[in-house]
Amino acid sequence: MDTKLTGKTRIESDLIGAREIPAEALYGVQTLRGIENFSISKFRLSEYPLFIKGLAITKMAAAMANFELGLLTVEQKDAIIAACGEILDGKHHDQFPVDMIQGGAGTTTNMNANEVIANRALELMGHERGEYQYCSPNDHVNCSQSTNDAYPTAIHIGMYFKHLQLLPHLEELIASFRKKGEEFSQIIKMGRTQLEDAVPMTLGQTFNGFASILQDEIAHLNEAAADFLVVNMGATAIGTGICAEPGYAEKCIAALREITGWDIRLSSDLVGATSDTSCLVGYASAMKRVCVKMNKICNDLRLLASGPRCGLGEFNLPAMQPGSSIMPGKVNPVSPEVMNQIAYKVMGNELCVTMAGEAAQMELNAMEPVMAQCCFESVDLLINGFDTLRTRCVDGIIANEDRCREEVHHSIGVVTALNPVIGYKNSTKIAKEALETGVSVYQLVLDHGILTKEELDTILSPENMIKPVKLDIKPRR
């Protein structure tokens, strides 16, 4: 909703004083102060729907627990839960305008949620916005809570949602590489180490390799994400549970499990957990691992597709757009390039998360807001990058089979396949002569009478060079 449609206002007060709030706004005075104090990054909470979902779930669970303890009336509990339910349905997200990067260890975000939920609950109860004597952002929505347990719990829940959102996009990219691996399984090409000719392989093995190294990362992401299911709800300010009644933490955890269906658990040491943001550090690191491999893959895609006439040219990437404002006909590998840049950004975010993670002091880490922003942003970047690379690059790759085969036939690297039969010393002599004369390894072996044509064809057949084999040929060393 547009909070400036009528120009009408209401008056709300806090510790600092009284302020006019747009009458249509569900948020209140503390959110307004947060807007004014932290116009920093343009990353608004409203742009992070799964974080907002985490906040709503956290507040809903707290209301359920507080009602069981007799701290809320039925009317207050029902209204708070209904307001949270509307937020979970995607409503009122425009009422979360605060900057993700903020001072105060997340208090602005927590109060934004408290105020929106309280004012919507008031409406559902038949009262006016701002009539907090009936349902207060602090006394009722935030009952038994501190920012220091509600905010990180909401981050954990939101990030676990993001993790579940990320995995299918990575799996689809892996499947695309696997499909190309199968399609190119019979295309022989040269492998390379240190950018130099090595030994033959298939183009399919290259793409299956891409798929396999990414597949390994799913387990690492799952392992890192599991830490999000351990929360400090009930810790309140510093982990001692001040202002929370006995049994509140356990009831809140039970409510969180009921709402989400996840195996959410209470930290075994709430004091330690309240200052510990290592789960964000761990997940950011897991995303960095993915990016290290994505950079390798995208660099390979760009190199192996280089050309079209004067590069390696083993395959063609789909032409997506003209590549130059001055060079006619030039087409660039824009999809791998943008994935490279996404990887750099995510790796930069990981460094930010690491530095903020080590900034914890005493019983709290006040730098958690930037850690949350970086992690949520990184997941979004990876999702967009994976989809772009898959649909606008990998799915449309076309192999240049003749070019790949020609490279193998003209490569000196095939001499390695002769090692078991003619020995390393003789193979070295052949390689040196081939390099000096330009004559193929195949022809030189025949010219010197080292092997018969039948023996040579057996050794250098594609199927015998791309996997371990036992050759029935007598060594000539």
Regions found by a protein language model. Name each.
Residues M1-R477:
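Conserved, well-structured ligand/cofactor-binding cores
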